[in-house]
Amino acid sequence: MKKCYPTLLATTVWAALYGQYAHADLAAQCMLGIPVYDQPIINGDLNQLPINILADDSRADYPRSAKFIGNVNIKQGNKTLTADQVQLDQTEDKVPLRTVTATGNVHYDDPLIILKGPRAWSNLNNKDTDMYQSDYQMVGRQGRGTADKMKLRGENRYAILDNGTFTSCLPGNDSWSVVGSEVILDREEEVAEIWNARFRVANVPIFYSPYLQLPIGNKRRSGFLIPNASYSKNDGFEFLLPYYWNIAPNYDATITPHYISKRGLKLDNEFRYLTKAGTGTLALDWLNNDEQYVKDKKTNTRTARESDNRWLFYWRHSGVMDRVWRFNIDYTKVSDPEYFSDFSSQYGSTTDGYATQKFSLGYAQQNWNATLSTKQFQIFSKDTSRKAYRAEPQLDLNYYKNDLGPFDLKVYGQAAKFTSVGKNNPEATRWHLEPSINLPLSNGWASMNNEVKLMATHYQQDIPKATENAEYKESVNRVLPQFKSEAKMVFERSTYLNNNYTQTLEPQVQYLYVPYKDQDNINNFDSSLLQTDYNGLFRDRFYGGLDRISSANQVTTGLTTRIYDESLVERFNLSLGQIYYFERPRTGKETIINSKDSTGMMTWAGDTYWKINDSWGLKGGMQYDTRLGNVTMGNAVLEYRRDEDRLVQLNYRFVDRDYIQATAKSAPAFQQGISQVGLVASWPLSERWGLVGAYYYDTKEQQPASQLVGLQYNTCCWAINVGYERKIVGWKDNNSEYDNKWSFNFELRGLSNNHSLGSRKMLQSGIMPYQRAF
């Protein structure tokens, strides 16, 4: 478990040592003034190596002293000392004390640091060294400063600075620095302790702390993280100051005071742990007496609640014990349905429509496994009659037995108890058993699988008197057989245009048969229509869950072609497939999606991906359903990306209105369909200036859905960015409600190879975050 944070002030720069990406031009510019140790590194016990001394003149009073005068150069291993004059003294004690005093233009360097000063003293017995009125410069990385006196102790483990300073800015640039009456650098523990610390900008003190501990390496250290400030119409001024607490090697926490001028002080807390039982994250956010929420309730724009406190609790855990036990928790609960509308959070989004609360305990052996779970949902909809169900509990069993002669056996079983989130909805206990036998056949270029399955389900339903559907029955048995046969072949050849490229041709065919069974007497507890992309054409189910098992008498055919380069990197693929229905699939009453009572209906789906070169990429997909007579869904992305800071992406997504009304009636905001075009761009204006932007337009509503623009200025030792975002946060009287938000960030930089403009981070902050196309 490892988490390294940049801390406030100098810490924001120290941790940047370990960034992975660099803006090449600025990185090269920042390294121009940095010394590099270009001599061969000598390993071993350096103190046992011989000492070589060169000087214009020398005098000796053996064995008590020796003096070297003029252009003195002393070298031992990787260490070099030069000065105008050097004197070596040795006492005549039983254990002689040997010291060296250097004066005049003293210069010391090794692979880690360079020291300069008018005078230096060193104890050759224990290697203690003092440098007076010294300047120091780190080697191979940014970092320099001064000290009235610099002391090296503990075989150079400790560097103690009296009235010391530190900055990551290049020589001649003092944009910022940290000053302390005493600074102790511990190279082994990788930490710097500063007493009476003053943070200065352009030599003007702006922050004081009696004690400050800063990381100077990759070890985790407690401290303040980079602050964040923003302003929005709905929330006013916001300021976040995170504090990272390194509790133990396997525990840490982040505590973030979050001031919101229109709401109050919110505390965001995250705790991470790693134990024998697994790894996990706990989060608790709390805002006492939300002032804006009180006002919103008075205007009926927020749900009426007795409490005005806003909070979030989150727990995610994943663990394995003794190689057979598995523990998983995914639990999110908020104070009210509008929480994610009012607060941005990494733990959920208002577009999800609900918060998941799931606990599961699993046990696995070689041929079987079992999982006991509970699943609940906190629904954000204000409709209390909405049909959403909890599974409390649910038991899933799987048994596998391969190589039964030529056959493979699988048995799946489930028992679940469903309770309703809303009022006056049916509830049930469901038992399901699903044995299947497979006959797989394959060789080097083809495969075939034949499967016979039996799906037996029993329902014991509790039906309230207020239920509108009179067809529901308390006890229902449903038994359905299924037969599926699928075959696939793979052919390959060298391409005509380039013999180093390989093209594959992959035809695929599947026949699926499930007889019809009227299921209108069963309430729908957990089934929803699955998306039919190309891979979805070859599923054996139209619905997820078990409450709706559609009839099927259909043949699915598909063809995929791929092109690989000489390094076996996939450069292009195209898949096109269709389902031909001999009988219309149905589960009971007709709906828009299966309203036509005729054979010959088809569903088409295609996906493509084209990596044109290392900078250009294209991908997309489309589904067409003859039952609706329309394109049901489509998406396309064209992207140019030269590096992390230079990219332009054009994207489009479409979902047909009839398809949504047939499959997602509980999403009123999208009942008119989805048709959105987006443009995302990031580009450096110069080595130091960068611009990012994102614009999404809803062609159905004929209005912008989201807009984002950000400007960043980056130097070798600090960076600043300003962002503006306009997004839809709700609906009122069928009109969109927008929020305008300004954000401001200041970051110290310098001791790293990371001179990136941070464009990716800015694009990820939007309500529709950037996603790579390739």
Swiss-Prot record:
GO terms for biological process: Gram-negative-bacterium-type cell outer membrane assembly; lipopolysaccharide transport. Together with LptE, is involved in the assembly of lipopolysaccharide (LPS) at the surface of the outer membrane. GO terms for cellular component: cell outer membrane; transporter complex. Residues 1-24 form the signal peptide. Coiled coil: none annotated. Pfam families: LptD (PF04453), LptD_N (PF03968). This is LPS-assembly protein LptD. It is found in: Cell outer membrane. Keywords: Cell outer membrane, Membrane, Signal. It comes from the Bacteria. It comes from Photorhabdus laumondii subsp. laumondii (strain DSM 15139 / CIP 105565 / TT01). Belongs to the LptD family. Component of the lipopolysaccharide transport and assembly complex. Interacts with LptE and LptA. InterPro entries: LipoPS_assembly_LptD, LptD, LptD_C, OstA-like_N. Disulfide bonds: none annotated.
